[in-house]
Regions:
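Unchanged
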Residues: 74-162
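Intrinsic-disorder-associated interaction segments
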Residues: 2-5, 157
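Conserved beta-strand and immediately adjacent loop positions that scaffold enzyme active sites
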Residues: 48, 57, 144
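Short connector loops at helix/strand junctions that flank enzyme active sites
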Residues: 42-47, 64, 119-121
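Conserved Nudix-box catalytic region and its N-terminal flanking loop in Nudix hydrolases
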Residues: 2, 52-89
Length: 172
């Protein structure tokens, strides 16, 4: 456990640099701790979808060797649910999606080009009739898109990102 008295947010980020993954508890004594934490990062907002078809299968994609869900960055002037729908369509080729409602918001941090980012992803439950051919968006390093049975979820998530596991928390 780290507290703001012991360590600034910036010092905390430097301390965890080099860890591949993990959970860290960081207490910030502030009326708005998230806002205080965000100051150390460049905030990236994104939208994504948990898409199910009539058979109850879930749409996954494989990106850089890991199973993932379709998601992407919010564009200027775009609503976050529109972003989620657009990203699912672009990354998988699925059209005619029904956005059923917000599922969860996840956060993760990463370092790129010597800069730290906080990615806030808004996840939505979606439905598709599943008739379209899946078309992985190669320019986003997506190798394959596939409808997966929910009973395979636990195994799939072992080769995934920890923030994605939060999206399915309580499902198995």
């Amino acid at each position: 456990i780290f507290t703001l008295k012991d360590l600034s947010v910036e010092a905390f980020v430097k301390k965890i640099d080099g860890y591949k993954s993990g959970k860290f508890l960081f207490y910030i004594d502030s009326p708005d701790p998230l806002k205080e934490f965000e100051k150390a990062f460049t905030l990236i907002q994104a939208g994504g979808g948990v898409v199910r078809n009539p058979q109850g299968r879930i749409l996954f994609l494989k990106r850089r060797g890991k199973w993932d869900l379709p998601k992407g960055k919010l564009e200027i002037g775009e609503d976050i649910s529109e972003c989620a729908q657009r990203e699912v369509e672009e990354e998988t080729g699925v059209k005619g999606l029904f956005v059923l409602g917000k599922r969860v918001v996840t956060y993760h941090i990463y370092k790129q080009d010597q800069r730290w980012y906080l990615k806030e992803t808004h996840w939505y439950n979606m439905y598709s009739d599943g008739r379209e051919d899946l078309r992985p968006q190669k320019e986003e390093d997506i190798e394959v898109c596939a409808w997966k049975k929910p009973k395979k979820l636990k195994k799939l998530l072992k080769n995934s990102f920890s923030s994605l596991r939060e999206v399915f928390k309580g499902e198995f």
